[in-house]
Regions:
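Alpha-helical transmembrane segments and their membrane-interface boundaries
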Residues: 1-212
Length: 213
């Protein structure tokens, strides 16, 4: 355990170097400015979409979706818009919401978890939970969808410039992923468990919320 503490101390000292501290500070300031501007443009109800967008942009500089480049870009944008539509439909009725949430989360999770170790699903699930937790009226839906589309487009732009020169010959396209879908694979089972867990949590949250109204 002494060696573990020593390694931890060395790691802390390494991260306390002036250059690292300054770069981290600049990054934090940039994130705050981005989220603030996002909220100013699209409204406070959509500021968390900005949080998800900047999180995904930073993540996808290095992380890939295991999809062909063009399909990864399309999947990113459409997934964000799909989550906005699904969460609004889910608000009609808790049990309808459970079904809609389950299907949407499963589809999105499955498409981006071919390479499990990348955890590429995180910003998508985070976004779904955030927008589900900040309900809006139907009249506000167009603005939310625009916010989600812009967020997805910004992520796609970062993804394109970060991965356009990388070899994606071993990556799948969506049709191949659907054709080879197998309930015994880790990808399928993980997506199923993720969709079930998040959908149940959202159902319980909506029931508790209605009980306190």
């Amino acid at each position: 355990w002494k060696r573990g503490i020593e390694r931890m101390i060395k790691s802390i000292k390494k991260n306390l170097k002036p250059k690292i501290l300054i770069s981290n500070l600049i990054l934090i300031i940039g994130i705050v400015i981005f989220v603030t501007l996002y909220g100013a443009v699209f409204g406070s109800a959509n500021s968390l979409v900005g949080v998800c967008a900047i999180t995904a942009m930073l993540m996808f500089v290095d992380v890939h979706l295991s999809l062909k480049l063009n399909e990864a870009i399309i999947t990113t944008v459409l997934s964000f818009v799909l989550m906005g539509v699904s969460s609004q439909i889910a608000s009609i009725n808790p049990f309808l919401g459970f079904v809609v949430n389950f299907i949407s989360i499963f589809v999105v999770s499955y498409l981006v978890t071919n390479a499990m170790e990348t955890k590429a699903y995180l910003p998508f699930i985070l976004c779904y939970v955030f927008i589900e937790g900040t309900p809006i009226t139907w009249s506000e839906l167009p603005r939310r969808l625009i916010a989600l589309f812009v967020g997805g487009a910004l992520i796609a732009l970062v993804y394109y410039f970060s991965h356009r020169k990388k070899d994606d010959s071993d990556h799948m396209n969506i049709s191949e992923m659907i054709k080879t879908m197998n309930k015994n694979t880790l990808q399928f089972n993980f997506s199923l468990r993720m969709a079930l867990a998040v959908s149940i949590a959202m159902l319980l949250g909506s029931k508790i919320g209605r009980a306190h109204v």
